[in-house]
Regions:
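ABC transporter nucleotide-binding domains
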Residues: 4-6, 11-184, 189-203, 209
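Charged, amphipathic alpha-helical segments
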Residues: 208-216
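Short, charged/small-residue-rich alpha-helical element at the C-terminal edge
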Residues: 215-279
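A general boundary/transition motif marking the beginning of the first structured unit of a protein
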Residues: 1, 88, 101-102, 236-237, ...
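Extreme N-terminus of proteins, especially the signal/transit-peptide cleavage junction
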Residues: 1-2, 216
Length: 279
């Protein structure tokens, strides 16, 4: 079952066509990464899905509803973590979550959400005294307090230290385990590679690649094989690394040589992203 269906989506601002007829679906319970450089159309697309911006053309269904015609009950099923915070500085972490819980008919327990986002030791600290990364964790908690079915996460780990990022990743994985659907936008390509079941790469308002991260890295960029032979450093690039490694090993065995310093450097999602978004 699809949580999000987009067909032929278009949006222009005057003469600038920000989104140019894109199509994609997000399955229920999936983490979907929407990637692309600034100005690619990500924000416009997400705001249309959230119901905050009207489209010019195309079909959009989110949880079975056109966001432009959505009811308050539909909005309760949507959680949004914005890139910029709008927190109450004089409230504590727990007070903040209780305030936002009051906007929903069936919210999650605020103390449970505090633990979920790793702020247990900060639950009684005022927002203004939190670090930037801790405030982002509170933003994530606010996005989850209504127990939504679909969560939009816009750059969710900006400002996090490495440990906090790993904690946030585990939280997002737990959401998937609970059957929640997540749309993730991020500039951290390792984050998308770790979390997303599928990704779509936007450039100039069109989707230039879509698929599982492992599929995207499977053949679009050549694998690099490095080794030393007779003191000479050798670098080879191939789209069939398994076959080439077999050939190199057979050649070395036949000659009684060692393949010193052998390394196989497979393309990452970042390599694919840079190739696809290059001007």
């Amino acid at each position: 079952m699809s949580a999000v269906t987009v067909q032929g989506l278009r949006k222009a601002y005057g003469d600038l066509e920000a989104v140019r007829g894109i199509d994609f679906t997000i399955e229920a319970g999936e983490v979907f990464g929407l990637l692309g450089p600034n100005g690619a159309g990500k924000t416009t697309t997400v705001e249309i899905l959230e119901g905050y911006r009207k489209r010019d053309a195309g079909l959009v269904e989110v949880l079975g509803t056109d966001p432009q015609k959505a009811s308050p009950a539909w909005h309760e099923q949507i959680g949004v973590m914005l890139q910029s915070s709008s927190l109450y500085p004089n409230l504590t972490v727990r007070e903040s979550l209780r305030v936002f819980a009051g906007y929903y008919s069936r919210p999650r327990d605020p103390d449970e959400v505090v633990e979920l986002v790793g702020l247990t030791e900060k639950r009684d600290v005022r927002v203004r005294r939190l670090s930037g990364g801790q405030q982002r964790r509170l933003d994530l908690g606010i996005a989850l307090i209504g127990d939504p079915q679909l969560i939009f996460l816009d750059e969710p780990t900006t400002g996090f230290d490495p440990g906090a990022r790993r904690t946030a990743w585990e939280t997002i994985r737990n959401l998937r385990a609970l059957g929640k659907t997540v749309l993730l936008t991020t500039h951290y390509l390792d984050e998308a590679e770790q979390l997303a079941d599928r990704v779509a790469v936007l450039r100039d308002g069109v989707i230039v690649r879509e698929g599982r991260p492992s599929d995207l890295t499977g053949g679009a960029v050549e694998t690099e094989i490095r080794y030393r032979r007779g003191g000479e450093a050798i670098v080879e690039r191939t789209q069939d690394p398994t076959r080439r490694l077999h050939e190199l090993t057979a050649e070395a065995l036949a000659r009684g040589e060692e393949l010193e310093g052998l390394e196989v450097l497979r393309p990452t999602l970042e390599d694919i992203y840079l190739e696809l978004t290059a001007e």
